[in-house]
């Protein structure tokens, strides 16, 4: 093991990072005898979910023998459709599974938020099934604009989005899906409170779905086509992730919070450092964290590209299950572990933690006792600065020193613990006669959280401080924010948020708004100062009577003293059996919803005559490819939302934003040129740099280019979810074999594929090259790499995954 002290700006107060690279957690391939199978009828009964889990786990153990498994592997492999097929194929007889094997998984449930659920439901409808094969839920949280306060905003949102909400509720009734109405809460918080359980595997149509890892649940963010695969009962495919271990030692103190763990880690790993990996946390430091604190950390694993994140089951997990009226779950877990402990083979025993001796592909150690608060940004979640150095960096970078707004809550940081820690600061400030100097917004994560905070007096404390309590929805975090402070587009300003993502222009549509990510406590304290250079640990604020006031370190409660309050019954879940008589109607003149037309299948030859629509430079996120905010209203209407495609991308050759040039030299916006070429029948490709598609699980970032005529995307590297989404929609993602070849291709170049059709016919086996013809007539050959699997090759040949699924294949 190599020890590395990181003393860079993101290093903070010498938080120690230990990194180790090594082989997979594999020691033997000894096959266990069949006596590891359990006879459940003659033993202590287990609930069906855990009986199924443990039965499959014993199958996994027979295949892998005495290999030591991490918790993530235990849960993931125990959801394989056929463990022997997945774990032995493409591996060395069960060795070197990570990063090589293609896992065909059967998730336990699917959760969908309203923006992505529209397209997922439209695709599911094409499959002509009476009900989903597994439980599913729809959560109305993305379409409510935050502005004046919860009551006004929710009322306006319901009226504005009535057509979409009615569509989703009708679909839920018809197919027997749970429906969480607008105002019920943000999907990730609602899932944590109601559906997440240790050992489950879920898919969520949102990149921050791994939030549920705080309760030892494997939850993976996916696009709508992936969700439909699971809903129709087909195995869902995933390249076996590597396992990145994060050992937590020590205990948080003073101003440090769980949020700072992931802010610090993001600074170390960068936005690409977790790609292809599950982040698994372990160590004695884990025992000091609350379940919701662990969820916060897992939530932001998406910002480093991780497939998902997970924590072991702890006493805090049990307390959270108790407080959310799920005490039976703790009894079920005890029953499972007790049942498994009776196995004559120690390798077949089950605990909700990694096996002793399990190894990680990389190991990072964070000492919580020396961790200090961090602030990340602007414009990227991995630009990490310790609080002690932030004032200096603000001045060096000439960032705005006036804080225009502080926003806390969201799916990442709206727990009872978060809010009561903030409450302690507000009470401190109230005694000193202080009010926030910047606009201060609070977003409760769910009606359960809001109602409990109201019952316990915390909400009143927020309101007395002048805070604006927004509705239980995503709001400003997803770009649904109608600012009331007069800050106009083009005005440089700074906001501080406890959110999870801070891409340029994301929150308010203003590319000059700098969003800095921090814990709710740091956001709150700095909002009182109204300054980005204020350090609440060392600095003071002048009170109205001229005295110096310093905040005491925040403190709060892990959870309420009594169980959570349910809140407004009208905001509760609508849960029902499928009703085949429910009609789902879409007006042919609707601007919000439109039935899908199937994409054409792949031709029976290589692609030729493609043109490069635009060559993109710099960060190209899913926000860049398919913006959220005001565009969310078109999520169910592919032609309409396609008019925003790549509309904030930077043209490499001109430096312009949202500019592309036709073959005759005429200038257009990128989506305008895409539409023109679609009308001409001119198919095209995009060329881009690293981590293309970083950010959300937004499948529209794949659907829109496909709709406009994209057949290939050529980059230096892809974000995991987006690469999968492209293949599901019939677009071929290719990466440069030699990154320097990025400089050899230009907008307008003619491109033909070489070997692509043969590779697809061979189930993903084979190399692909691109023959590029320049305007001068010069031809060059660019070698590429791909990660197309056998199943994905079938999707591309069919034109899309939906084309296959709708035929029952």
Walk through the language-model features, giving the residues of each.
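Fe-S-dependent hydro-lyases/dehydratases of central metabolism
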Residues: 41-809
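N-terminal mitochondrial targeting presequence
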Residues: 1-47
